[in-house]
């Protein structure tokens, strides 16, 4: 098992949870129990332009927290190594629940409630279902990314296409070998 250092604390990596536009997220074990360690990467992304990814994550976390968006708590930041330690939210992602037919209707209802917080603040989040976990009856957004509102990328026009058995979701699953 690999060990990651964050501000002098050791975290033993259990597994890769996922790779996003901005980094790799690992399930890790620390003295406080299971956590997520996100390592910022600098790999190119053809459809998204970043400035300082770490500062963007921190700014977006503060913005979304102030709105009351349920997210994992930010536990530590190591600016030198570009790593974040986040609360681990256990359970299957919304995508995994869609694939097994176990996503309850309350998940989409809660997503629409989140939109009622985001849109007046002129913000969108990444609505893709891998970014959400329903835990303890609460829908958590496990990413920290937010962007200025644009109707073409809001939940109704973009995100909802991936929250049901749609041609877009089936194409994504096939492209990523998950069908």
Regions found by a protein language model. Give the residues of each.
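Conserved alphaE helix
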Residues: 106-114
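C-lobe/activation-segment region of protein kinase-like
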Residues: 107, 119-124, 134-179
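The N-lobe alphaC helix and its flanking beta3-alphaC-beta4 segment of protein kinase-like domains
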Residues: 49-67
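ATP-binding glycine-rich loop module of kinase domains
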Residues: 13-16, 21-54
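Conserved structural core of kinase catalytic domains
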Residues: 69-107
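Conserved protein-kinase catalytic-loop position immediately C-terminal to the HRD catalytic Asp
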Residues: 130-131
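Juxta-kinase regulatory segment immediately upstream of eukaryotic protein kinase catalytic domains
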Residues: 1-14
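Hydrophobic HxD+1 residue recognition
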Residues: 127
């Amino acid at each position: 098992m690999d060990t990651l250092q964050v501000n002098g604390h050791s975290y033993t990596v259990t597994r890769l949870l996922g790779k996003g536009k901005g980094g790799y997220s690992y399930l890790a074990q620390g003295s406080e129990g299971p956590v997520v360690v996100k390592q910022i990467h600098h790999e190119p992304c053809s459809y998204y332009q970043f400035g300082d990814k770490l500062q963007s994550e921190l700014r977006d976390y503060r913005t979304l927290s102030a709105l009351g968006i349920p997210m994992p708590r930010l536990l530590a930041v190591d600016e030198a190594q570009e790593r974040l330690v986040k609360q681990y939210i256990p359970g299957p992602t919304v995508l995994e629940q869609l694939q097994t037919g176990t996503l309850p209707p309350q998940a989409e209802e809660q997503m629409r409630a989140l939109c009622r917080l985001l849109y007046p603040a002129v913000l969108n989040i990444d609505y893709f279902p891998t970014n959400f976990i329903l835990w303890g009856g609460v829908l958590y957004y496990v990413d920290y990314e937010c962007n200025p509102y644009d109707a073409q990328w809001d939940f109704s026009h973009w995100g909802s296409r991936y929250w049901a058995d749609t041609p877009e979701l089936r194409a994504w699953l096939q492209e990523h070998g998950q069908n």
